[in-house]
Structure formats: structure tokens, C-alpha cells
Amino acid sequence: MSSSAPSTSAPTKIVIPDLVSHCTIPVRCNRHWKQASVESKRWLFRGGNLSDRKRDAFHGLKAGYLTSMCYPLAGYPQLRVSCDFMNYLFHLDNISDEMNDRGTHGTAVSVLDALYQPHMHPTSRVGKMTKDYWVRLIQTASPGAQQRFIETFDMFFQAVTQQAMDRANGVIPDLESYIAIRRDTSGCKPCWALIEYANNLDLPWEIMDHPIIRGLGEAANDLVTWSNDIFSYNVEQSKGDTHNMIVVVQNQQGLDLQSAVNFVGDLCKQSIDRFHYLRENLPSWGPELDREVEIYVDGLADWITGSLKWSFESERYFGKAGLEVKKTRVVALLPRRA
């Protein structure tokens, strides 16, 4: 009796983990979301610098919907600034994917100059956009939130520049190094500062630097980022992009594709569990500060559940098939581009 040889053909699909069922945090959405979404896209498109194809992609992106689930209690002015930043951040992500490390560095200089010196008059498009939302943000953001925003956005550009160098040199980092740099390339950390801004919080550094508060931010960042690596894997593999945890795990541990997807999915579930554990063990700083901390941690939770819901309703990862993928969890792999 002969046995057939195991198949060595390339996989044609992956089954993504069920992270939605593992996340029991309720979804909330800001009542101003439609108006803020429309006006924010109009702001992004101002000047006609985007092609019709890129404009269509931003309509399908639904960044305003994501923002509205992540900052559900924000007043309209704060939500609008947050929507502008989110559209702008996705715009930066798109253009950084097309840049080498020199181009990324030039963008970083334009952005950080506008943040550190808002009285100056930027000449680049990205510098002007940066100044535009920043001068609105600093009208009501606490000094601590402003400082945390600038510092973490600076870290974002340092990490994105390193990512561009790795991409140019064909470097796939080990898992530990990847996790460290991905926590900054995600862009989540400045979004955590926006939680303070959007909710008019004024949290002191001794609270924001507390190990449990930092751990909660890290757990939320990990879930948002690592789940994004799963959801974006198909598009990225079609372009040959290796800055993805699934590729890193395959390379380091010698796993097949589906096993690597499952591995990253387990890490995502562990990050949700870690968030809940830390949330249940928050210390007390007195009634007034405890209320502000509760609002901040709720904001991190909104990011966890909002990002999961949005990932299937946006067209960024699964095109028009997001809700079908959410139901079946099966993703047909795209062919590699020549």
C-alpha cells in the first residue's frame, strides 16, 4: 500500500484567530462620528495632493469610524482633531512604506519641526498638516499630554526610520527586537496621549509612569499591533513586505504559515488577558485622580475593541469582504506582485 507524499505547494489561504470572541469589552461610538469623518477627509484632501486611487482608498479606510470608537466621549472639537491625526497617521504610514530611510528622515524632520516649533511656518505639505492639527490640539491639551505626544511621535519616527533601513537591507529581526520596534512603529503611543486630550484629562507623570499604567498601555498596544499584523499579512505578503510578526516567527522558529498565524493569535489573546489582569489590579491615587485614571484606562479598552471591530469593516485589509472574513475567518492569499 503506497502512501502519498506530503504536499509542498505554497499555501493558498490562512485561517485567522477568533480575537473578537476573546474580547468581551463593549464597543462604544462617538455620536459626532459622521460629521467628523466627512470634514476630516475634506481636510486631508485639501490641496489636491492625492490621486483618485488614494482618495478612494481613504474613503474605504473609514479612519473616522475607527477614531469615533476609540474616543467615544470626546467633544466635537477634540474628536475632529483626533480624526485629522488618524487620517494623517495613515497617510504617513502609506508614504513611509514607499520611502527609503533618507526620505523617512526628511519627513520626520518636517513633522517634528512643526511640533517643537509651532510658531514657525512649514513649507512642506506634511509640515503644514502637522502644524494645522497641532495648534488646535495644544489649545486644550494638558502640558503632560502635549509632552507625551511629542516624545512618543519622535520615537515613532526613529522606529520607522530603522524599519526602512531593515527593509532596504533585507533584515528580518528576531522576535524580541521586532516586538520592541513594533511598539513604536504602530503609532499607538501618541494615540494614547490623545486619550488624555480627547477626554480633557490632566494626569501627572507619577501616574503615567506607574508600572501598571505603562503595562496597560503596552498590552493595548500589543493587541492592536499584533492583530494588525495578522489582518494586514495578506496584503503585505503580496508586496514582499517582511516587517510583520508572522514572517518574524516563521523565520525564527521555522514554523509553517498557519502555525505562525496561530502563534501570533495566541500572543494577541494573551495581551487581552494581560490587560484585564492589570486593570483589575490598579492602585488608588485618591477619588479625583482615580476617576481620571478610570477614563484613561477605559480609553485604552476602547482602542482594543474598536480596532478589532474596525479591522473587518474597513476595506484596508480585506477589501469588501471584511464581514465575510469575520464570519468564516478564512483569508484567500493574494498572488505575489512581480
Curated annotation (Swiss-Prot):
Residues holding (2E,6E)-farnesyl diphosphate: 316-317
Cofactor: Mg(2+)
One GO BP: isoprenoid biosynthetic process
Residues annotated to bind Mg(2+) 3: 228, 232, 236
Motif (NSE/DTE motif): 228-236
Keyword annotations of the record: Lyase, Magnesium, Metal-binding
Coiled-coil annotated residue ranges, if any: none
Binding residues for Mg(2+) 1: 93
GO molecular function terms attached to this record: alpha-copaene synthase activity; metal ion binding; terpene synthase activity
Enzyme class, UniProt record, top EC level: lyase
Annotated EC: 4.2.3.-, 4.2.3.125, 4.2.3.126, 4.2.3.127
Residues marked Plays a critical role in the stabilization of intermediate cation (site): 90
Reaction it catalyzes: (2E,6E)-farnesyl diphosphate = alpha-copaene + diphosphate; (2E,6E)-farnesyl diphosphate = beta-copaene + diphosphate; (2E,6E)-farnesyl diphosphate = alpha-muurolene + diphosphate; (2E,6E)-farnesyl diphosphate = gamma-muurolene + diphosphate
Annotated positions binding Mg(2+) 2: 93
Functional summary from the UniProt entry: Terpene cyclase that catalyzes the cyclization of farnesyl diphosphate (FPP) to various sesquiterpenes, including alpha-copaene, beta-copaene, beta-elemene, alpha-muurolene, gamma-muurolene and delta-cadinene.
Notes on the domains: The conserved DDXXD and NSE/DTE motifs are important for the catalytic activity, presumably through binding to Mg(2+).
Family (UniProt): Belongs to the terpene synthase family.
Protein name in the entry: Sesquiterpene synthase 1
